[in-house]
């Protein structure tokens, strides 16, 4: 299960860093964006904020684990894991679920990545629900078992 962030800051103040500096997850760079991807539990650590206070924010995608499928020929498919995102304006856009990015400060943000639910291996029982994924106050609910 992948869980990622696009991290950026704005402005040209030379006293402070132009962009947010952060650690955690697998980090990739695309233009002025740093993307932190978590495939398991971890910590997104903001070590330095960018320019003017309040101008720092992160775009986010939080995906929960899907539900496991039901057993036997009549077993239903598991439900998809929940999905939440928010973004800043620019070349990277997100769905209309949230039209604004999340402001961050110089602190640690624990990351929980929800796993998929186990499928049923026998006739009758449902597959297990998927687990929630969490970033700060954003929670995506795990999918229901089939």
List PLM regions with ranges:
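Glycine-biased low-complexity/repetitive sequence motifs
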Residues: 1-146
């Amino acid at each position: 299960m992948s869980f990622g962030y696009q991290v950026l800051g704005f402005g040209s103040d030379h006293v402070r860093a132009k962009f947010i500096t952060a650690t955690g997850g697998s980090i990739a760079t695309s233009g002025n964006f740093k993307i932190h991807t978590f495939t398991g539990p971890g910590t997104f650590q903001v070590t330095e904020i960018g320019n003017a206070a309040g101008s720092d924010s992160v775009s986010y995608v939080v995906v929960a684990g899907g539900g496991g499928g039901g057993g036997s020929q009549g077993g239903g498919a598991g439900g998809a894991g929940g999905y939440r995102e928010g973004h800043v304006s620019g070349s990277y856009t997100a769905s209309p679920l949230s039209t604004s990015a999340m402001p961050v400060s110089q602190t640690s943000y624990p990351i929980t990545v929800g796993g998929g639910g186990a499928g049923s291996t026998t006739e009758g029982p449902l597959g297990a629900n998927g687990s929630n994924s969490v970033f700060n106050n954003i929670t995506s609910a795990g999918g229901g078992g089939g």
